[in-house]
């Protein structure tokens, strides 16, 4: 779209999100139990379930890093993929499982994301190092998500 045009979105990232305080009062705060990952996505799903619509400004720019560095596989940069620490992968896996359990999260997103999660698990535990640590932390995240664990990781 043209610079400045708006379009509707399913969810937005917290960085650069502008929300009227009245909406925040009605929808509630971000879920701090999710700690690092998916707090924005969860809030957006909750807002949409209450009838709010989300919009983004086309071609707006915001300097923001979503990972340590781009992922390269067989010499090619994978667009939309970034290296993350094994601990960050833990939160990504745990929190997506926590979202799967919430009834206001759209079923279509859950199905699509489960496929994405399987691809991410395979890629980071088989192809992208540190493979063993990545796999271990992601398995712990899946397990803790299934158990309903929230907040920062604790041994």
Label each residue range with its predicted role.
Residues 77-90:
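A short acidic, glycine-rich active-site loop
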Residues 17, 23-28, 33-63:
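A short, conserved alpha-helix in the catalytic core of glycosyltransferases
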Residues 92-97:
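A conserved mid-domain beta-alpha-beta active-site/ligand-binding segment of alpha/beta enzyme cores
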Residues 46-50, 98-101, 124:
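Short glycine/serine- and small hydrophobic-enriched flexible loop segments
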Residues 2-22, 84:
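A recurrent flexible, glycine/aromatic-enriched loop bordering the glycosyltransferase active site
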Residues 101-155:
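Non-catalytic, C-terminal membrane-associated alpha-helical segments of glycosyltransferases
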Residues 57-80:
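Active-site donor/metal-binding and catalytic loop motifs
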């Amino acid at each position: 779209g043209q610079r400045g045009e708006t379009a509707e979105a399913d969810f937005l990232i917290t960085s650069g999100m502008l929300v009227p305080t009245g909406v925040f009062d009605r929808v509630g705060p971000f879920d701090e139990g999710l700690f690092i990952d998916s707090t924005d996505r969860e809030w957006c799903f909750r807002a949409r379930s209450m009838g709010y619509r989300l919009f983004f400004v086309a071609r707006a720019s915001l300097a923001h890093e979503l990972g340590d560095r781009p992922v390269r596989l067989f010499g090619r940069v994978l667009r939309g993929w970034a290296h993350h620490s094994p601990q960050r992968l833990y939160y990504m896996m745990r929190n997506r499982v926590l979202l799967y359990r919430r009834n206001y999260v759209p079923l279509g997103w859950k199905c699509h994301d489960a496929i994405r999660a399987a691809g991410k698990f395979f890629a980071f535990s088989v192809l992208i190092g540190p493979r063993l640590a990545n796999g271990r932390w992601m398995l712990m995240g899946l397990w803790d998500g299934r158990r309903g664990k929230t907040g920062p990781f604790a041994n």
